[in-house]
Design a protein with these regions (language model features):
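DNA major-groove recognition helix of helix-turn-helix
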Residues: 33, 50, 61, 80
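A short, Lys/Arg-rich alpha-helix, primarily the initiator
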Residues: 1-23, 31, 102
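Short, basic-rich loop-to-helix N-cap that marks the start of a DNA-contacting helix
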Residues: 40, 51-67
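Interfacial/linker helices and their anchor residues that mediate assembly or domain coupling
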Residues: 80-114
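The DNA-recognition helices of helix-turn-helix-type DNA-binding domains
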Residues: 36-37, 53, 80-84
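Short, solvent-exposed amphipathic helices
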Residues: 64, 75-78
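Short alpha-helical DNA-recognition segment
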Residues: 23-48
Length: 114
């Protein structure tokens, strides 16, 4: 029997899979996500995000996606390669950061058990 290699977890893949799990179409989700000027994002823009061709242009979009899709915003910020505002304001010294990062990596190897 052939081993199946799991697909890499990306921002776009997470958005698409969660949207489908919630039974939302791209059109329905796009209508709930608004740009800073209050207009909804386009279906094509959402499609580009889901297929990792584009990244969300603003923090507010990530926060809205997290809320509508019932996902943790910190997780989406991580997948998008961004740090939440409170983390950016309190950037630790290099030694503290290295210790925290090492602990995080160990927790991943342990399957999140700690």
């Amino acid at each position: 029997m052939e081993d199946v290699i799991p697909a890499k977890r990306t921002f776009g893949r997470t958005i698409m899979e969660t949207r489908k799990e919630l039974g939302l179409s791209q059109k329905e989700l796009a209508a709930h996500i608004q740009r800073e000027d209050g207009t909804p994002i386009s279906n094509q823009y959402l499609n580009d995000i889901e297929h990792d061709r584009r990244s969300p242009t603003g923090r507010h979009l990530i926060e809205q996606l997290a809320k509508v899709l019932k996902l943790g915003p910190d997780y989406l910020f991580f997948l998008a390669g961004q740090f939440p505002e409170d983390v950016r304001r309190h950037t630790p010294d290099p030694e503290h950061f290295a210790q925290a990062w090492s602990a995080f990596r160990r927790s991943l190897k342990d399957g999140g058990k700690r």
